[in-house]
Curated annotation (Swiss-Prot):
This is Gas vesicle protein A. The gene is gvpA. Gas vesicles are hollow, gas filled proteinaceous nanostructures found in some microorganisms. During planktonic growth they allow positioning of the organism at a favorable depth for light or nutrient acquisition. GvpA forms the protein shell. It comes from the Bacteria. Residues 26-34 are annotated as: Beta-strand 1. GO terms for cellular component: gas vesicle shell; vesicle membrane. Residues 35-37 are annotated as: Beta turn. The keyword Nucleotide-binding does not apply. It is found in: Gas vesicle shell. It comes from Microcystis sp. (strain BC 84/1).
Amino acid sequence: MAVEKTNSSSSLAEVIDRILDKGIVIDAWARVSLVGIELLAIEARVVIASVETYLKYAEAVGLTQXAXXAX
């Protein structure tokens, strides 16, 4: 299988459009300790997607039915 190299580059708008279309999840975790004593722990999960992408995901995993039944 050969790898093709292209000289075309993506613009920032194309990259943002692709991220919003597909969605991206950033999961971060950090811990600060001193002499074995934990001073600070940070956990973060950031989800970036368009509303349409999120609604497709929510429907696929059944989140929209739970919200409709609660109302």
